[in-house]
């Protein structure tokens, strides 16, 4: 039997033993971590995941390196999509990969000691270097894709927050309300424009009340975006009524040379609602 086949057979035979040792030496103080051994079911799930990790890892001895890394990468990426791994701080996952590396290296040293005569000069170091390389590859791949998943989740949450912070509320068959509150930055202004136009077109809104009384700060950019929205609404046949315009908003609008002549303006939202009843 060739050396690589012996290594594959040795590590395949010790999968259960290594997984058991990994679990037995685990110390996790964070109760919310994936690695907190709450009960027998959780423990067995983790152990099976570790067995699976070793089974995939062991193919490094019998597959061409390029093919092995491509197939192994697919498994690691699949692992990063596991919700429990996503919910666990990445430093904990890295810590366990490093513990696995130390454990795996220990078993490699054991094999090398028992089969010293099977190694050609420099061959032991070659396999030891490959083990380190594969574990480094594992950690890098996991961190890279975990970060990508985290960004996707963050973007989804941000979009949800943006949508909730600028809702188009239906008041009647043809009238709706857009209450704007808080700070408006460039990203939010762009979302408000796109979301409002889509919502009005979809609901066949003919008249939109835009209330600005909750907007904290109004600078030149914000004022420009608000009136850009009004112009865009006009192009799709939606008339706009503004309410809650504070003096600083009016001043900024005048400085920008914005034309109010085609816009209905009311002092507050109550007046705007009464106007359309």
Swiss-Prot record:
Residue list for modification Phosphothreonine: 186
InterPro entries hit by this protein: Bact_StressResp_Reg, STAS_dom, STAS_dom_sf
Keyword Mitochondrion: no
Knockout mutant characteristics: Cells lacking this gene have an increased sigma-B activity in response to salt and ethanol stress and also increased sigma-B activity in response to the energy stress associated with entry into stationary phase. These results indicate that this protein is a negative regulator of sigma-B activity.
Post-translational modification (record): Phosphorylated by RsbT.
Quaternary organization: Interacts with RsbRA and RsbS in the stressosome. The stressosome probably also contains RsbRC and RsbRD.
Protein name as annotated: RsbT co-antagonist protein RsbRB
Residue ranges annotated for the STAS domain, each copy included: 165-276
Keywords: Phosphoprotein
Function: One of 4 functionally non-identical RsbR paralogs, it functions in the environmental signaling branch of the general stress response. Negative regulator of sigma-B activity. Non-phosphorylated RsbS binds to RsbT, preventing its association with RsbU. Requires any one of RsbRA, RsbRB, RsbRC or RsbRD to sequester RsbT. When RsbS and the RsbR paralog(s) are phosphorylated, they release RsbT, which can then bind and activate RsbU.
Taxonomic classification: Bacteria, Bacillati, Bacillota, Bacilli, Bacillales
The gene coding this protein: rsbRB
